[in-house]
């Protein structure tokens, strides 16, 4: 327990800036039975978690501070005879995403495991020149007398799927303000919903 508590203190100090409220608790439950690994299997699992990359892989060359390619270990499950790790791979570059996917797969096989791909969606690559983005920005500025906030983000968005269906498809993603998205406290701002409606109808009139 002392070793675990010392390790917890080291981790809390290491992540004090990015995760200031990090809490690690170790409880001694007494004797009991649970799944455990022998020394060789334990070392193999440590190698798996250390050798397969995790986190930011590459930053964008076009936009300062934007992550371009990453992967994250989201779920790790230890069963009676198996260990399964689920990674989410994201990239705004299709070639980088495919390379990283292949790299993780090859490393998994090298370590004696197998892998499968699920929920694969194409990358939505950044365009320096976008006519629809410029049109939306101009319409927003004119309708609401303020500059449109145009941002890029490192996330999985359906536009990547749609853009891959037609060559040279120009896409943007926009919508009303949503607070606490993807949580039970999710809320939609009604006033921004009205602005979104006015914006999209104005742009559609220009495209008609």
Could you tell me what each predicted segment is?
Residues 1, 40-50, 58, 98-101, ...:
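His/Asp/Glu-rich mid-to-C-terminal helical/loop segments that flank catalytic regions of hydrolases
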Residues 3-14, 103-111, 131, 135-143, ...:
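Generic non-transmembrane alpha-helical segments
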Residues 6-10, 45-46, 92-95, 104-110, ...:
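Short, low-complexity, polar/charged sequence segments that are solvent-exposed and flexible
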Residues 23-25, 114, 149, 170:
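Conserved beta-strand segments of alpha/beta enzyme cores
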């Amino acid at each position: 327990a002392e070793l675990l508590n010392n390790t917890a203190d080291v981790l809390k100090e290491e992540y004090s800036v990015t995760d200031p409220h990090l809490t690690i608790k170790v409880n001694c439950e007494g004797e009991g039975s649970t799944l455990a690994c022998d020394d060789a299997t334990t070392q193999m699992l440590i190698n798996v978690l250390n050798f397969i990359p995790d986190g930011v892989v590459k930053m964008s060359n076009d936009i300062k501070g934007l992550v371009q390619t990453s992967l994250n270990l989201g779920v790790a499950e230890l069963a009676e005879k198996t260990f399964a790790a689920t990674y989410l791979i994201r990239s705004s570059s299709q070639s980088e995403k495919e390379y990283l996917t292949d790299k993780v797969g090859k490393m998994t096989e090298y370590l004696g495991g197998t892998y499968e791909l699920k929920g694969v969606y194409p990358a939505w690559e950044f365009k320096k020149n976008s006519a629809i983005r410029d049109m939306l920005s101009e319409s927003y500025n004119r309708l609401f007398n303020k500059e449109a906030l145009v941002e890029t983000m490192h996330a999985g968005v359906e536009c990547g799927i749609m853009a891959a269906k037609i060559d040279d498809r120009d896409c943007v993603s926009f919508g009303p303000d949503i607070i606490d998205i993807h949580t039970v406290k999710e809320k939609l701002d009604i006033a921004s919903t009205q602005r979104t409606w006015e914006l999209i109808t104005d742009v559609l009139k220009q495209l008609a």
